[in-house]
Regions:
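Catalytic histidine site
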Residues: 45-111, 117, 141-143, 179, ...
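Terminal peptide-recognition signature
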Residues: 66, 75, 79, 138, ...
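N-terminal secretory signal peptides that target proteins for export/translocation
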Residues: 1-20
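Boundary at the C-terminal end of the N-terminal hydrophobic targeting segment
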Residues: 36-40
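Short glycine/Trp-rich loop-beta-loop segment that forms part of the substrate-binding cleft
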Residues: 160-202
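Catalytic nucleophile loop of clan PA
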Residues: 229-260
Length: 297
């Protein structure tokens, strides 16, 4: 399927038992809303289609995580800057990348696979980064029209290699919570592809399937608008979304609060210092992502 393929955008029936829902053909647009009290949405904590939320980003031999974010006129791939760029923040980690995610229907095995020409996307102004907060957005498609007439077309440099019939999961900007509204002690779920796990190729781990970690918001840094999580992450998790869970009388509400940017090491040993994973992680607040998205007209 070439890059000139027209993608049709439409809404599904929006059943009340979905916390993350809405559809684009190829894009399953998320509404993160409360599930009514007393209503059983699913046998698990989150709806089945949410397990397909994270995106695996492959650049050469390196990998990272990300997620799709949709506005009225654009579709973006959100990730950490260091997933795409070398430490100088000017040199791309590679000229080509692949973005892989699973179908919104967990029974469908077809992946959504996009080939990204990072060099072309960068030269055309479709990659924008925030060096201070280590977040990046890649515009992958333009949306035109309204209602039933809405269409989504990939930008130059993006080629759809395969697409599941049921679409794939993405989020709308209205599902995002800004830094000022993040609540310390609330539960969070981190989605991503921690590729450094099982370095001896443990057969029980499917490296092309995302893993979830559950933790809490341990603290915040107002100056940097960053969030400290009591939740272990590993190389490969960078760029993945952090979803906060809040509960009230109406049920559970899910909001995207950040992007994983690093784990917090701790030093152990006397004569020989060894850095280990402390179990804490840092996420950039979504304010920086929203600011980048707002620069696209």
């Amino acid at each position: 399927m070439g890059s000139d393929q027209t993608w049709v955008l439409f809404d599904n029936m929006r059943p009340r038992n979905h916390a993350l829902r809405g559809i684009l053909i190829f894009f399953w647009c998320i509404d993160l809303v409360a599930v009514a009290s007393g209503q059983t949405a699913t046998s698990r904590l989150i709806p089945d289609d949410n397990l397909s939320y994270p995106v695996l980003i492959r650049i050469g031999t390196t990998t990272g995580s990300g997620f799709y974010l949709t506005t009225e006129r654009h579709v973006f791939l959100v990730t950490a800057t260091h997933v795409l760029y070398e430490p100088d923040r000017r040199t791309l980690n590679g000229m080509q990348a692949e973005a892989l995610s699973y179908a919104s229907d967990p029974k469908e095995r077809t992946q959504a696979v996009f080939r990204l020409d990072l060099k072309a996307l960068s030269e055309n102004g479709n990659i924008r980064i925030d060096n201070l907060h280590d977040v990046a957005v890649v515009r992958v498609a333009m949306v035109t029209g309204e209602g039933a007439a809405m269409r989504s077309r990939p930008v130059p440099g993006v080629v759809a290699r395969s697409a599941p019939k049921s679409g794939y999961v993405t989020a709308g900007t209205h599902t995002v919570k800004r830094f000022a509204d993040v609540l310390v002690s609330n539960e969070v779920i981190v989605f991503g592809y921690p590729s450094s796990l099982g370095v001896t190729n443990i057969p029980q781990l499917d490296y092309f399937r995302p893993l979830l970690r559950k933790g809490i918001v341990a603290g915040t840094n107002e100056a940097l608008k960053s969030i400290v999580l009591d939740c272990a992450v590993y190389p490969g998790n960078s760029g993945g979304p952090v979803v906060e869970l809040t509960r009230d009388a109406t049920g559970t509400r899910f909001r995207i609060i950040g992007v994983i940017i690093q784990y917090v090491p701790f030093e152990q040993g006397d004569a020989t210092k060894v850095l280990s994973n402390s179990g804490y992680a840092v996420a950039a607040g979504m304010d920086a992502v929203l600011d980048l998205v707002a620069t696209f007209k």
